[in-house]
């Protein structure tokens, strides 16, 4: 499991097969507002992601997801 910090939000990248309910159980004191599936390619110089996430009660939005991922900060 990897934890990646983004400005004021935290992202947890789980292994394949994890569900949104698993994320909520792992972090009971935090509000989990989005769960999704992305493929990360991380090297020492850059982070790339492919895929889309689904915010709760909204539609998938690839453009917003890419905006989010471009602002990743290594924790």
Regions found by a protein language model. Give the residues of each.
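Intrinsic low-complexity, intrinsically disordered or marginally ordered coil/linker segments
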Residues: 1-75
